Amino acid sequence: VAETPAEVVEESVAETPAEVVEESEADNKTVESIPAITIRFAGDSGDGMQLVGTRFTDTSAIFGNDLATLPSFPAEIRAPQGTIAGVSSFQVQIADFDILTPGDNPDVLVAMNPAALKAHLHDLTPNGMLILNEDAFDEKNITKAGYKMDPRDSGELDSYRVFQVPMEKLTKEALKDFDLPGRAVLRS
């Protein structure tokens, strides 16, 4: 048992993924137990990144994890949607030991649109996990973010573990039985 936070960190760093990975026979998925992780949620201001980050943080705390957060939102009153100036983010470091900071570089980046990807990709750790809202990656949003071509096709993301999720489609499907206007559905 570690006596100080420094010893806890040393013990945690000493573990390799091979030591903490186990195979679940029931669903044939690999489960990886890690001592600490830093996650950053990024999207347009108004997309709910602060709310998502807060809910994620609250849920993690319920499970007894230590955590530190870093909300970030633009100083502009309302920058144009889909632009880098309008990107808001929420970073949380979660650990099974005492931590004092929200982490430096995220291990996981959840990018809700191309502008969020452009604003935060440079911070993602090598071989980090990148979760993209594939529904937002249309030609208009890609161009507005300042990309010359779709970053998913350019090779720029090759050094990351990329997961594309149709978040808008899934949200619409989950809320189809509620009497909500289209715009409210995407803000839910």
Feature-to-residue mapping (PLM):
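Active-site cofactor/cluster-binding pocket
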Residues: 2, 19-188
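Threonine-centered tandem repeat motifs in low-complexity domains
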Residues: 4-6, 16
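Periodic low-complexity repeat segments enriched in small/acidic residues
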Residues: 13-14, 26
